[in-house]
Amino acid sequence: MIFSKNSQLILRHQKIFKNKIVFFSGNIEDELPINLLTIKTKIHLQKSQNFLKINNNKNITFYRKLLVSQDTVQDCNILIYYWPKNKSEARFQLFNILSFLPIKSEIFIVGSNSSGVKSAKLILEESIKLKKIDNANHSILMSGILINKTKFKLEKFFKIHIWKNLIIKSLPGVFGHKKIDEGSKFIASTFSEKINGKILDVGCGSGFLSVSILRKSPKCVVTMIDRKLSALESSKATLDANFFKGEVLSSNIYSNIFKKFNMIVSNPPLHDDLKINFDITKKIIFNSKKHLKKNGELRFVTNHCFSYDFYLKKVFSEFHIMKKDNKYKVYQAFLK
């Protein structure tokens, strides 16, 4: 079995964990959590991770929740945290976990240099004195003892943006957290009162696209999907803040979708962690046929320099670029 470079660093110290109750969290990259020898392992999943298959091992427990509770970690004595690409997301997750983890627990944080993992020392300086214990292949493993619990309130981590009288609420790590994405604004400028019926928002993030549609056409029935639990929480908060209603579901693209829609809308991510990845957009295109009604529409925004004509031709007989500028373009395709 091949493990990521971050997991390989942890494996070099596997003797430490043999007689411990270990809590895994963060940007878990592979199957190490279900293979590391421990007394008991708890795995905190905050997004869909297909490589981690739930098994029948009684010593392994999965928690698929945005937030950790006292009951989840009160018997744990080690945290292994995979640092994500986003520092504010790491701070959000760690402040939640460390507000409940027992004092004197051992904390292990692993991440690549390019992700900004070194900033963990400063972010957590009041709770842990982190020290580097190993490094290899541009990754670092740090550890320390929890000396002070953090203070955590979910509402304090929401960032609020206002756009055309809409309130957009976003948690750290959610796309468009620092500011509303310009590509999202660009596709939103194509929305009109003519949009109707059932709408599927793929990769909903903060819920910006859905509330932008509802602002123009409030009778639409929106379904918002994302693989990240922080995005789902943000979308719910955005709907509530604007007094709109919608269905918010956990789904890795279409994995949890079993009905058809009049329109699928998306601002697909171009990055998978720190790497550029076009696969998500391709999957949205190729599998949209299964989830569109007759004459249904797929509408998505992308960078001006990228072309998806080749892939759209394989699925749709009719498509065009409905709007473009020197940065973005919006594709519109119809299922005949």
From Swiss-Prot:
Any one GO molecular-function label of the UniProt entry: 16S rRNA (guanine(1207)-N(2))-methyltransferase activity
A Pfam match: MTS_N
Domain of life: Bacteria
Disulfide bond residue pairs: none
Enzyme class: transferase
Keywords: Cytoplasm, Methyltransferase, rRNA processing, S-adenosyl-L-methionine, Transferase
Main location as per UniProt: cytoplasm
Catalytic activity: guanosine(1207) in 16S rRNA + S-adenosyl-L-methionine = N(2)-methylguanosine(1207) in 16S rRNA + S-adenosyl-L-homocysteine + H(+)
Coiled-coil spans in chain: none
EC number(s) from the headed UniProt entry: 2.1.1.172
Record bears the keyword Aminoacyl-tRNA synthetase: no
InterPro entries per the UniProt record, alphabetical: Mtase_sm_N, rRNA_ssu_MeTfrase_C, RsmC/RlmG, SAM-dependent_MTases_sf, Small_mtfrase_dom
Location in the cell: Cytoplasm
Subunit structure: Monomer.
Function of the protein: Specifically methylates the guanine in position 1207 of 16S rRNA in the 30S particle.
Family recorded in the similarity comment: Belongs to the methyltransferase superfamily. RsmC family.
Name of the protein this chain belongs to: Ribosomal RNA small subunit methyltransferase C
Organism: Buchnera aphidicola subsp. Schizaphis graminum (strain Sg)
